[in-house]
Amino acid sequence: MKDRMSELVSLLNRYAHEYYTKDAPSVSDSEYDQLYRELVSLEEQYPNEILPESPTHRVGGKVLDGFEKYQHQYPLYSLQDAFSRAELVAFDERVRKEFPDASYLCELKIDGLSISLAYENGILVAGATRGDGSIGENITENLKRVKDIPLTLPEPLTITVRGECYMPKASFDAVNQLRQENGEAEFANPRNAAAGTLRQLDTSVVAKRNLATFLYQEASPTSEATQEDVLEKLSQLGFSVNEKRVLASTIDQVWDFIEKVGQERDKLPYEIDGIVIKVNHLAAQEELGFTVKAPKWAIAYKFPAEEKEAQLLSVDWTVGRTGVVTPTANLTPVQLAGTTVSRATLHNVDYIREKDIRKDDTVIVYKAGDIIPAVLRVVEGKRVSDEHLDVPSKCPSCQSDLLHFEDEVALRCINPLCPAQIMEGLAHFASRDAMNISGLGPAVVEKLFAKDLVRDVAGIYRLNIEDLLQLENFKEKSANKLYNAIQASKSNSAEKLLFGLGIRHVGSKASRILLEKFHDIPSLAQAEQEEIVSIDSLGMVIAKSLHSYFAQEGTQILLKELEEAGVNLAYLGEKAAADAVLSGKTVVLTGKLETLTRTQAKEKLLRLGANVAGSVSKKTDLVIAGADAGSKLAKAQELGIEIQDEAWLEQL
């Protein structure tokens, strides 16, 4: 009986792969149904013997309590965008400085939701959303209902793969037809439909909506030599892999593919919003490395944004956390890139003057990066008024005088007690890239502020359940959930806190670099400007901003309150002892390593106290060169920099 159940699971998973992924079924529908019914019958008789990879999980429904956070073992990076051929040429030139003979694999950029799938011994054990790249949401049960995701692999591999989950156009039309018949609001576009479906708490809904996937990356260490090889491996393992791709040896060939796909785009059975261009050889990818947000070996070309005409009705002026006052146009509604747009950014007061935007103008609207609606220009032939837009002289939040500094394009409110700035600052503090307090978004911040429950970030940690129950629409469950999220954030590594404080010019990357150097926020607060300027990639602008921030009495009070509330102020990443072998040394890796992966080599260097840089300069102390080292090695030799090999590093 147990053997028969195992045999049926294996057969049905194989047949499902042939049907959904290869579109080449080897058995008829009736044969499949007969085997499926036999398995269902056996599982009903022997529920304790049901295998986790059973295909019956795909259609069975369960109601989930919610989605837990999922720590990605391997970070998911975003991609640098390109909107013109010139930007692709610049990317190509950067790559060819290091690898003159580089080739590129061009793949379709599917307009869906990024997912990560983890397998242990060939069995799917976890599936998650991208989230902030480090922490996503565990949506394993929902992903098990996506029919072309294999529950088991043909080999007992432990592997993590990445891809895109999307809703085909036909499925999107069917879902919206059903929603229309049921009197429900229709989804704006397939991407929103896919994202909404994967966040359903009722898994049976996911099973009915016919989502699909394309996998494109092996995130765990791989023995493959090229991106082409990776895609072939994924296909052999049973994953859906998009066959519409091309290997290009020149940027001209890349552009030819972009133009060809652009012409065929509307005929595809799924939505795409661009082409992803990747350096094909994985050794070259490792050598080129990453910025804090994106790989240097890939770029995403985005197709030109759709443009529509709309009439300007009015302008709202809103205050951001740094005091910048931004104008937003209220427009007659238009359909743009699958969504209804009635508001669009006007950027700043200088932009309004430059484009000569006036009251009641007809304007061209587009989505910058296919995401943010923005006003592009005026249709002057349809102008009905010569009246200029009213530009405020007072802050719309606190009524303080607005300033327009000579070196800035924006109006700015400099009142530190401005309610809008405080609320925006609180929302930033709780945001995903900062303290990542789930549930503490702008709407909840506004409610807390209105009831005078929170006035600064330390006040967040003074909140209790009773405070949260005062908020509109908050019940015991939602109050407990937010309270627990606040408490959990106390243990974040301090670079998240530093970024969350919203110090001008100090982004997430600078926060990490600073805490790697000074180890905790109190030590950073005592640092001299010269110490900060001496750090590679940081400059005087950041040093002055930090010095000014920490010199304020209010900052010292705030840090003390945070510490007393139990918020961690220390960096929890790798810290090198002051007497470590490479303490304070700037080291560059180049060439192909034989025994260590580049990630392992970098981690070891960090443990030894080194700062690992991506390029060779006069500030470089040491270059570790593997096989086929290129221009970095040549430059190191030219500058007289110490050069060692992988064997030397392994002995340390």
From Swiss-Prot:
Active site annotation, chain numbering: K109
InterPro entries: BRCT_dom, BRCT_dom_sf, DisA/LigA_HHH, DNA_ligase, DNA_ligase_AS, DNA_ligase_CS, DNAligase_adenylation, DNAligase_N
Enzyme nomenclature, EC number: 6.5.1.2
Residues that, per the record, bind Zn(2+): C395, C398, C413, C418
Superkingdom of the organism of origin: Bacteria
UniProt family annotation: Belongs to the NAD-dependent DNA ligase family. LigA subfamily.
Protein name: DNA ligase
Species assigned in the record: Streptococcus gordonii (strain Challis / ATCC 35105 / BCRC 15272 / CH1 / DL1 / V288)
